[in-house]
Amino acid sequence: MTFFEIHNASVWRGDTEALRDFSLDLRAGESTAVLGPNGAGKSTFLKLLTGEVRPEAQRGTPCRLFGEELWALEELRHRIGVVMPEEVARFEPGEIAADTVLSSLRGAYGRTRDMRFSQTDKSRALEAMELMGVAAIRHRPFGELSSGERRRFLVARALVHQPEVLVLDEPSTALDFSASLHLIVTLRQLLQQGRTLVWVTHHPGEIPPEIDRVVLLKNGCIFADGRKRDVLTEKVLTRLYEVDLKVRWSGGWCDVRFQ
């Protein structure tokens, strides 16, 4: 089943054509990495996926999410959980870490901001924090957490909605080795639950072994799309980054180095 589809669309950001003649289908139950250098169009793609921007020009079928036109129903976008690095700045240093997860439920499912959280809400928040390995530190102030701990709380904040699709924007940024390993374990659990993951990054070495499809972006266009080992080759990556690169594989990880 295809959960996101767009065909022959263009998106402008000011005077720049951020996405040009852009076509992409994403399938439910399939983990996908979207990879590209700075300025490739990754951020614009994310905004398109979450309904924050619309194509200025489009030929063919409209942009669809779960089979419906993306901007037709607001609730469609609630079926996607998005983790963005800049979300960290939204929270006060003194805010209790667990409250950052619970607060994600404000406004969801018709709630108003002054409604109290039910025991079900609290149980779901605790489950999400346990899944991310941060339940033991949930009573600490957010400002006292390490960068990696904050990132895991952000993922828990997205998971508390039990989304059908989880989008991770540069998820390995600021994560230490231990936190990165925990995130990989969590990805396996999410995949076993049938969740769909979209992993957006600028570095091929950050794509975990669980990802089976890679989409490369360059200058607002699809540069390559296919199975990971078919796409992440020395020839393709050298053309993508315009520098000679050496690729080695180890345990499903792609190790990329300068020639």
PLM segments and residue spans:
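Conserved structural motif at the start of ABC-family nucleotide-binding domains
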Residues: F4, A18-D21
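Helix-to-loop junction immediately C-terminal to a conserved catalytic motif
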Residues: T50
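Conserved ABC ATPase "signature" region
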Residues: L102, F117-I137
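Conserved ABC ATPase signature
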Residues: M115-R116, P141-L145
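Conserved catalytic motifs of ABC-family nucleotide-binding domains
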Residues: Q162
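Catalytic Walker B motif of ABC-type/P-loop ATPase nucleotide-binding domains
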Residues: L166-E170
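ABC ATPase nucleotide-binding domains
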Residues: T238-Q259
